[in-house]
Amino acid sequence: MQRWKAAALASVLCSSVLSIWMCREGLLLSHRLGPALVPLHRLPRTLDARIARLAQYRALLQGAPDAMELRELTPWAGRPPGPRRRAGPRRRRARARLGARPCGLRELEVRVSELGLGYASDETVLFRYCAGACEAAARVYDLGLRRLRQRRRLRRERVRAQPCCRPTAYEDEVSFLDAHSRYHTVHELSARECACV
C-alpha cells in the first residue's frame, strides 16, 4: 500500500512539474515571437449585413491592380432595399436553361429496390441515365412546333417542341441478388450512350 501511495505522489509531482515547465515554455515562446501570433482582428458585426459585406469587399479589393469597381460587384449598393420578388415561370426557365449542361451520360449509385422494378434487394447498382439540354440539336420543325404551342393551336395533344436527351444504346445486363438470395439479371436497365432525339 505504501508503494502505491508513493507512486501516486510521484506521478502527481511529475505531472505538476511537467505542466509548469510547458506553461513557462509557451509563455517564453509567445513573448519571443511578439505580435506575429496576435490573432486576426475580425470586423464587428453590424445590423445591416450589406454594409458589412461592402466593408469586406473594400478590404479585399484594396490595393489590387486589376480590381473592378465596387459598384459592379454589388449592384444593390446605393439603392434602398426593396421587397423581394418571386421569380416568375419565364425567369425560372431562363435560369434553368443557363445552368443546364448539354445532353450526356450521368450516373448514380442506387439500391435496386429504389428503381421500382418489383425486386426487394439491398444491393446497389450503378445506374447510368441520360440528361441535359438539347438546344443545339433543335431543328426548324422544333421551332415551328414551339410557336404553334405558344399560340395554342395544338391544344389536345401533348407534344414536345424540343428534342429530348434519350439513350441510344443500353448496357447489356445488370445482375444482382435479391433479399431471398436469388440471382436476377435485368437487360437494358442502364444507358450506355446518349443523344438528342
Curated annotation (Swiss-Prot):
Biased composition (Basic residues): 82-93
InterPro entries: Cystine-knot_cytokine, GDNF_fam, TGF-b_C
Residue numbers binding heparan sulfate group: 149, 158, 160, 162
GO cellular component: extracellular region; extracellular space
Cellular compartment(s): Secreted
Domain of life: Eukaryota
Disease affiliated with this protein: Genetic variations in NRTN may contribute to Hirschsprung disease, in association with mutations of RET gene, and possibly mutations in other loci. Hirschsprung disease is a disorder of neural crest development is characterized by the absence of intramural ganglion cells in the hindgut, often resulting in intestinal obstruction.
Subunit structure: Homodimer; disulfide-linked. Interacts with GFRA2 coreceptor and RET: forms a 2:2:2 ternary complex composed of NRTN ligand, GFRA2 and RET receptor. Also forms a 4:4:4 tetrameric complex composed of 4 copies of NRTN ligand, GFRA2 and RET receptor, which prevents endocytosis of RET.
Protein's name according to its UniProt entry: Neurturin
Organism: Homo sapiens
